[in-house]
Amino acid sequence: MPTNTTRLLPLIRAVLAATSALALVATAQAQEAEQETSSDGDSTTLETLVVNGGSGGVITAEGYVGISSATGAKTDTPFLETPQSISSVTEQQLKDRNPQTLLETLAYTPGTRVGAYGFDPRFDAFFVRGFDVTYTGVFRDNLRQPAAVDSIFKNEPYGLEGVSILRGPSSALYGATGAGGLYNLVTKRPTEDTLREVQVQYGSHDRYQGQFDFSGPVNEADPVYYRLTGLLRDADTEQVGVPDDRAYIAPAFTWKPDEGTKLTILGEYSRTKTGGTATYYNDPATGRATDIFAGNPAFNDSVQKQARIGYEFEHRLNDTFVFRQNARVSTLNIDADWDFAYGPNADDPTLLDSVAGTYDERLAAFVIDSQLEAKFDTGALEHTLLAGIDYTKLRFRALDGRGVSPPLDTKNPTQGRPVDPIDFNTRTVQDQWQLGTYLQDQIRYDAWTLTVGGRYDWVSTDTDTTDLATDSLTTISQKDKEFSGRVGLTYQTDFGLAPYISYSTAFLPNAGFNKETNQPFKPTESEQEEIGVKYLLPNSNTLITAALFNIDQKNGLYLEAVGSSNIQVQRGKLRSRGFEVEANTSLDNGLSLTASYAYTDVKIIQGPVGTVGNYVSSAPHHIASVWAYYTLPEDGPGAGLSIGGGARFVGSSYGNDQNTFRNSSRILFDASVGYDFAAIDKKYEGLQLQVNATNLFDRREAVCTAGYCHRDQGRTVIGSLRYNW
């Protein structure tokens, strides 16, 4: 790979140089800070932001630098004491980059592979450390966010305070999760200070959006606080017949009768309209993506409605014990029509034969997690003991139908083609419950912290599938149970360096059965060994982390060709080994920066015929990124101006598990510029203009995953006018 390595070297050098420079600059800043007793007009004061929520995912951050989170241990634990690789996307990063999707939100986090399916506004599909976490790795406020088939909850970035990322197997606290780790999305919560914001946006493809965010005390007498966040969007996309419309509203209330008691209610409703198909036609002769839209603008509506309401309750019983309970009910309904062109017509090669379908899916879930935390000493040992029990109940129902569609005319590929009504062919109903109980002790002695935890889960899954044409019913019932654990040791020096080592496991129950053996699938299991170091520079708001990891996953599910059809088989084993480094800083001089590099080697140890020993498709060895944002001094000629820019490198990878062809490497650039009108006159205080661009140079190359090829999302430019008062 000489060419790819050559292309990668400049960005790797940039990331490593940025990391080294951060240490030097931050150290110099710290030395200057020690010598200064007051700030001058050129400095920018950083505010420590606490995203409250108890075990729901509290994040404490200063600018771009996450300091502590409840994601790593379900207790508010400093990153330096967490014996596992952990990162955060802070509130300030969200403001500076103005992401429009969850994938854009996570684009600069280490080891996270976004864009494996190219342009596709239907789903937020992504990988970490080589493992898909779309269905199993997304949590909301430390509670599992279930997903099934096409029923995947959409996550609005404007409704988030931040994201905490815990990489590697994490079932010791969270139960059914995958090998890659979990992404905990922290919902905006009520603030005690008054917050008022309105914003209008206009961007590429006639994207119109208005949004608002209000928070503060309900009145001056009662300890009750509210927050109301919402947006309305009408937008086209780069594909004809694929809109990106959304209506979103999220109310929240907090009641704090005393310092030891808090109840927060979190709600949300959204309606999103996009396309049932968003892919490009793949030419069977070459196996590569063309520029022809594979769908049908006249039969391509996908409407998703989702709602959730839940609470977080915390009560301090005494100086030792704190009780917490988090719960949520969520529902999702998606109705979609789709059309897909798959190959040339036998009689007329200018036509492409197509198939069409329709589906109606409904997902309802209830999740509750009850915890008791105790802090006490035994001799010289300090303990933070956590005991908990959680329960998840979900029901998934799907109606699916397949039919015929008029062929696609390649001479006029965007012309709509009428499709006759399609009847549903099958109905699937799945009921699943999971019960887990866990225990964890964080034991501190001098500079040492030992974290030991274990969890036992029981899972029951019942699946009924009905052929509506014959009214025949197939029922599958299975029960799984599994123990998961984690042990980690951290040593924290008095100058901010914290090396650690850990071992953790995860399990994931699988629905269905092996058609070769007629036996239910076993749970997918994984284990990880990790060693790393974290460095919080003294007297400087800079955090640098690095980690080496080895993950083994067994009993994975794969599709294997048997005759003329594909069946699911379970005889797989994957191994992921790699290295990650990340640096985040927000300095007093107005500069904030995040940089990361990840090397990941993911191989198929056991799998379908022709794949053993190969690399997993669309899993690049190298991923690197750098993002910087600078606010010019208030007393200089550029007062009020902020500029930002970033680069995201994705190394080459294979386009299928057979490793017969490759995806090329690529670098995508992003940019931002903002202006605070208060620099002109104080009467304009609160009025700000910001313009953000992603994929600035409109690089739209093919990216292939599991043998099917897509295209990168093209350039988008969005201007925002925001007013706070």
Placement of each model-derived feature along the sequence:
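Outer-membrane beta-barrel translocator/receptor signature
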Residues: Y158-E161, R167, A172-P251, P257-T261, ...
